[in-house]
């Protein structure tokens, strides 16, 4: 059995409802509904969730670990939330959050306006910092990757949009 799939999930104050092939996790920050693969059994035992494969097949074993990680992320998301921090490096690079839009000036001839999907918010504590928050880990990471994709850090000066924990390795310039 999968090592990840064996460990139980502590609910940390989240409510869980199991109904017809789906699990609904409700917490103080919101609600997430996730489909459960039929190869995985889910049992709710007084504040913890236990997952087990239906049979001993390799696919069921792998899916039990995957489903456990997805459900654990849902529990974490509705109780504490997820956030991803981005930093803008470069002269004149600015960011400003306005409602559900993120306005970026990244050295192009036009400003870049990124529309935030439902359930994801962007904050700009300073003009060169962006904090993307939400309850869905996959969605927060996807939005952060899309914003970074407008101007990824270039390898010679390091200018661009980078994750705050990202280390950009700079290349040496060509010598004559």
UniProtKB/Swiss-Prot annotation:
Pfam family, one: Ribosomal_L6
InterPro entries: Ribosomal_uL6-like, Ribosomal_uL6-like_a/b-dom_sf, Ribosomal_uL6_a/b-dom, Ribosomal_uL6_bac-type, Ribosomal_uL6_CS
Record keyword Cell membrane present: no
Any GO BP annotation: cytoplasmic translation
Gene Ontology CC annotation, any one: cytosolic large ribosomal subunit
Transmembrane domains' residue ranges: none
Keyword RNA-binding tagged: yes
GO molecular function per UniProt: rRNA binding; structural constituent of ribosome
Keywords, alphabetical: Ribonucleoprotein, Ribosomal protein, RNA-binding, rRNA-binding
PANTHER family for this protein: 60S/50S RIBOSOMAL PROTEIN L6/L9 (PTHR11655), LARGE RIBOSOMAL SUBUNIT PROTEIN UL6M (PTHR11655:SF14)
The protein's role, per its UniProt record: This protein binds to the 23S rRNA, and is important in its secondary structure. It is located near the subunit interface in the base of the L7/L12 stalk, and near the tRNA binding site of the peptidyltransferase center.
Protein family: Belongs to the universal ribosomal protein uL6 family.
Subunit structure: Part of the 50S ribosomal subunit.
Protein name: Large ribosomal subunit protein uL6
């Amino acid at each position: 059995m999968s090592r990840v799939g064996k460990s139980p999930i502590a609910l940390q104050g989240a409510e869980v409802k199991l109904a017809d092939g789906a699990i609904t996790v409700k917490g103080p920050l919101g609600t997430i509904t996730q489909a459960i693969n039929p190869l995985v059994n889910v049992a709710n035992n007084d504040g913890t969730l236990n997952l087990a494969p239906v049979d001993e097949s390799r696919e069921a074993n792998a899916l039990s670990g995957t489903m456990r990680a997805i459900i654990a992320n849902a529990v974490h998301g509705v109780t504490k939330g997820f956030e991803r921090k981005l930093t803008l490096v470069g002269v004149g690079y600015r960011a400003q959050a306005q409602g559900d839009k993120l306005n970026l000036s990244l050295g192009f001839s036009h400003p870049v306006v990124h529309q935030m999907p439902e359930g994801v918010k962007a904050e700009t504590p300073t003009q060169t910092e962006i904090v993307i928050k939400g309850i869905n880990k996959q969605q927060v990471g996807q939005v952060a990757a899309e914003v970074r994709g407008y101007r990824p850090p270039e390898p010679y000066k390091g200018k661009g949009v980078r994750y705050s924990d990202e280390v950009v390795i700079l290349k040496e310039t060509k010598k004559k």
